[in-house]
Amino acid sequence: MFKGLYTVATGMIAQQRKTEIITNNMANANTPGFKADQSTIRSFPDMLLSAVGNTNIPVDKKINAPFIQEIGAVNTGIYLQETLANHAQGSLIETNKTTDIALIDGLFPIDEESGNSGAIFFRLEHPDGGEAYTRNGNFTLDPEGYLVNGNGYYVLSDTGERIIVPNDNFVVSGDGTVSVDDVEVATLGVSFSLNPALLVKQDNGLFQTVDGTNLASAFNQEGVTFGFKQNFLEGSNVDSAKSMTDLLTAYRAFEANQKVLQAYDKSMEKAVNEIGRV
């Protein structure tokens, strides 16, 4: 009886967390460069129940022999195993702003361990040291003329330097070269991660490595191709229709577990109030 209560409770907790993840995805459906989170639910390891006892052997000396009888497997519930970002490219949105730049995915090698494709990101200077990474190319110029993102983090060049321009009248070519009046100023920095699932997702569409080390440059990486498009932004890759369906499914699963919990509660109430009187 109580084992069933614990199993139902794990199901409700898992579905609640899944609902929170889907809701956050839907809230960021219009956030540039946002990567939708995907959750994985799995069951806890099953337990094998066995009955242990003694049996009398009908002989003259009445020998008691122990026995073990397998009853069967019991599931102990489910849990939300992990949450991973979906790094598929979002659709392009034209903004006609020179400071808006979109990364265009090309070909990436496949990670042998995970079986997933790699991913590329803009390089940003993190104020706490090291680098942060993003797909949100909604950049601006600070008062000093440095190219920064919405958080005020400096956008880095391929050499790891801050990019400064006199005004927003600059041109970004398809290979990432930043030019002012036909004079090359810098090349936008892009980093490559062979297994982006290992990156830590932070607020405002930022990513960092687990140990704080910097990712390798995507330029001159074997098997890596990509491009840039100025006056465009990469939109969120959230599928609103699918997210709504998944949200309803998670809600129904939570509701079903809730009804089972109510049935257990009624059975316990009868056991205490009715059977106890006898």
Residues covered by each model-derived region:
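Amphipathic alpha-helical polymerization modules
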Residues: M1-V278
